[in-house]
Amino acid sequence: MLPRKIPQSVNVILKAAGRMPAGLAARMAVLLSLAIAPISSFGAAKNPSVSPQVAGYKAVRVHYGPMNKMIMPVQINSHPANLLVDTGSNEIILDTDAAATFGVGPSPRGLRYVGFTEINGQLLPVAFMQSLTAGSMNFGSNPVVLRDSPRSGTGKAQVDGVLGLHILFRHKAVINCRTRLVFFKIDQSRRMNLSGVASSEKFTMIPIHREASGALTVPCSIHGQTGRLLVDTGAFVTTFPDTFFKSLGISFEPTRVSARFPTGTAQRVSAAQINDLKIGDFKVPPAKFGVAALPRFALRQGGTKISGILGMDTLYICHAIIDLDGMNLFLK
């Protein structure tokens, strides 16, 4: 039986930060026909200077920047930095120029780099950071991939790199997209029973599968056609491949929005109205979604064919909680 009262520790993680203002909700309904409505202007937590206390976990606040980026303020080798929380990436990745300002670069022992790794067909150098902290959470020393990439915005909106699944999985992160909080487990003996109490809060639980490539996917269906979506907090908008929609006979219209992929290629994003998208057993409210010629690396994760990318706009609107301990996605 479900408890009559939600345990305080779990309630802190489930509790919403407030309703989306009606005007902004209307803008989101047409986000692709005109422009992307910034999540950063949606309702914020009541007291953002205070992080909630949950036994066995440390909470780190994030904020939303331009293009729906979930940004976590961190310290890299004691230097302030901003990292994109990205469940679509396996690694910690830093912009090469930004890394140099943090003292992260070639090995001082004569070797140029610690090693190299291939990401989406690119061979990239691996360096080492001595320390990484976020709020009161200390992640210690970590390998970091260096990549030349365009910097995003200025000031607080600037992103210096990516915080990927390497860290998020190691610390069994629970990401609440709506309340702008990421909980990291520090006591491995504790485990929250999110599934039981989430149902009483009218969340729908969808199992997350980790593919051989490391990607996180969830089941979906459109027009009765089943498939899998890549759960990607680094994607600013939920997007489907144009070939998939053409096969379903779904029409789409051009927009002024474009998306840039890690390889540096940019694709124009079209929009399509979808009224019957289901993620697991959760029926997504009718909305316009992105349609683009997605790169091959995004459409195939190991032996799994990907039907689309579940991006931050839908995750936020549907109050998403991504539980990397229980491996479940909660939506409502």
Per-region residue spans from a language model:
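Pepsin/retropepsin-fold aspartyl endopeptidases
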Residues: 42-332
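N-terminal secretory signal peptides that target proteins for export/translocation
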Residues: 1-22
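Bacterial N-terminal signal peptides
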Residues: 23-38
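Short non-domain terminal segments
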Residues: 4, 12, 37-40, 137, ...
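Short, flexible coil/linker elements and helix-boundary hinge sites characteristic
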Residues: 18-20, 38, 249
